[in-house]
Each structure stands twice: as structure tokens, then as C-alpha cells.
Amino acid sequence: MTLVKLRSGVTLEIEISGSAGDPLMVLVPGAGAPLDFWHPSYVDALIESGFRVLRFNHRDTGLSDHFDETYSIDVLISEMWELIDQFEARPVHLTGHSMGGYMGAISMLDKRHRLSSVTAISAGPTMDQSRYSELRMIPPDPSTWGVLIENTPSGNLSADLAGWMKSWRFLNGDVEFDQEHALAYTKALYRGDPRNAQVAVNH
């Protein structure tokens, strides 16, 4: 991983892999999620498929700069494109998870000429019950948020670990739980500024 300074003066932590001549795949994490969200095996598979891969940490994540003042998703999108401009002038592929998916979708409004594709994962619309019924969709179980908001990170990994692991086990469902991977990912949330793990609360 390395640090890159943007035109705006903000420094982001990034990792770029693969051959410079290959099409660029930009992996955009969700709010507060580190670039480690994108597992190395997934990155390797993309490289083997002919992509150059860019992973990065948003501000307030990893070793990227930390900010106490609030900001909008538009700021994150602008910084993402400043970063992309340093590596690729051709159209790129964006794959985003959660907030990262929204960043890709919003980019389609005024950056269509810079995009080869956009893939949004777990970035669905906000709908009321009537709209779910109209589309014949099943709404999220209300108890899901109840479990997740029980986790209130303090910025201290030792104190917070049990809450994170409870959340990961819940989200994992009935699939075999990879505790080693979950622990490594949780530790990645606390890299850099100790306030990073509270980014969802702060912003």
C-alpha cells in the first residue's frame, strides 16, 4: 500500500496491482470500510481476467487523511475521480459496495464518458412498504438493524472487538464463519487514526 496526494491536497492510501496497459478496475468500498474489504483472492482473480486493479481507502479510513468536519458523498466522489485521474485517462470499470455502489451510480450522471461499466453491490434503493409490494420484493427484516446498531465502536479495538464479531456472525448467516478473516478485517478498521472506526457515527 502507498499514499497518494490529490490535487486538492488530501492524501489517500491506495494499492494498485496488475499491468499498466490493462483496463482499470476501481474497487470502491462502502462507508467506513477499508480497502481490505476487497479480498486479495478477488483482486488476483480480476488481474488474471485482464484487469489492472485499484483499491483505496476513503478519507477517515486506514492511513488516509482524517477530518473532523462533516462532508457529503459528493466530496468522496470528487476525491475518487482525482485519484483515478492519476492512473488512467481512459474509461474505467467501477465496482462499488454499499456507499461505493451509490458513488458509481452517481458518477454515471456526469462521468459517463469516463466509465466502461458500473457494478453496484448491496446498494439498493430506499423504498416504503407499498413500493416493496408493488415490485413483489421482500423488505429487510426489521430486526436486522436492531442487531447492527447494538455495535457502538469506541475507537478501542480490544473493547470493541466482541461487538464487531457479533455483527459479523449475524451477517454471515448460516454459512461457515471465517473467524480469522473476520478478525483481520476488524483490525483493518482500526488502522491509522483511532477515530476511523467511528466514522459511521461521526459522519
How should these model regions be labeled?
Residues 6-66:
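Conserved HGGG/HGGXW glycine-rich cap/lid loop of the alpha/beta-hydrolase fold
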Residues 65-77:
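Catalytic nucleophile-loop/oxyanion-hole region of alpha/beta-hydrolase
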Residues 139-203:
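Alpha/beta-hydrolase
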Residues 118-154:
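Flexible "cap/lid" loop of the alpha/beta hydrolase fold
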Residues 1-4:
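A domain-start/cap signature at the N-terminus of enzymes
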Residues 90-133:
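Conserved hydrolase catalytic core segment
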Residues 74-92:
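Conserved acidic catalytic loop of the alpha/beta-hydrolase fold
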